[in-house]
Curated annotation (Swiss-Prot):
Keyword Metal-binding belongs to the record: no
Cellular-component GO terms for this entry: cytoplasm
One Pfam entry name: Pept_tRNA_hydro
GO biological process: protein quality control for misfolded or incompletely synthesized proteins; rescue of stalled ribosome
Name by which UniProt lists this protein: Peptidyl-tRNA hydrolase
Family that this chain belongs to: Belongs to the PTH family.
Binding site for tRNA: 15, 65, 67, 113
CDD domains: PTH
Described purpose of this protein according to its UniProt entry: Hydrolyzes ribosome-free peptidyl-tRNAs (with 1 or more amino acids incorporated), which drop off the ribosome during protein synthesis, or as a result of ribosome stalling.
Length: 189
């Protein structure tokens, strides 16, 4: 059974080290540590194939802006005939403290425009999410906070659980029950 992991972010160097690109950062970090193959495609996304313990899956970095990510996701789901319940979306969450992680089996968009667009394009909210906390300083306008490059200390803070994030991604690809993953990783402080 093939799975897809989608890291949300915005294309372009100016967004590279911003809170809103945490999904891209998590995917890139995972790819550095695992053998993979880039798949040429016409879906407006970077598509990578990975095999872990005989489980073949795809990792996706949509190359449209965050608010249009759903178009890329829908095209890839249709092309590879992958069910919505077999995707995991990695995204930033302003409601979680920096670096904290939370798995959700489904839900609304909570104001996150990338999630909103995936829900609209796929016509469902029944897909799994790995939320990575980026906190939020309410003294700064939200767009500015999410799209301003962070410093090295902030990056370390955000990625403090990167090993756990990699474990979750690996176990998801290998078909470990999502309920088991939530029970194991949602308790991490």
């Amino acid at each position: 059974m093939k799975k897809i992991i989608i890291g949300l972010g915005n294309p372009g160097k100016e967004f590279q080290n911003t809170y809103h690109n945490i999904g891209f950062l998590a995917l890139e970090s995972f790819l550095k540590n695992n053998k993979h193959q880039m798949i040429p495609n016409s879906y407006q996304g970077h598509l990578y194939q990975i095999q872990l313990n005989n489980c073949i899956s795809f990792l996706v970095k949509p190359q449209m802006y965050m608010n249009s990510s759903g178009k890329v996701v829908k095209k890839i789901l249709d092309a590879y005939q992958i069910k919505i319940e077999d995707i995991l979306v990695i995204l930033d969450d302003i409601y979680l403290p920096e670096g904290k992680i939370k798995l959700r089996p489904q839900g609304g968009h909570a104001g996150h425009n990338g999630l909103r667009n995936i829900i609209e394009c796929c016509n469902t909210n029944k897909f799994k999410r790995l939320k990575i906390g980026v906190g939020y300083d309410s003294n700064i306008p939200l767009n500015q906070y999410l799209l301003t490059p962070f410093n090295l200390h902030q990056k370390k803070q955000i990625l403090q659980n990167i090993d756990k994030i990699h474990e979750i991604m690996s176990k998801f690809i290998q078909g470990i029950s999502f309920n088991n993953l939530m029970n194991q990783y949602n308790v991490i402080k």
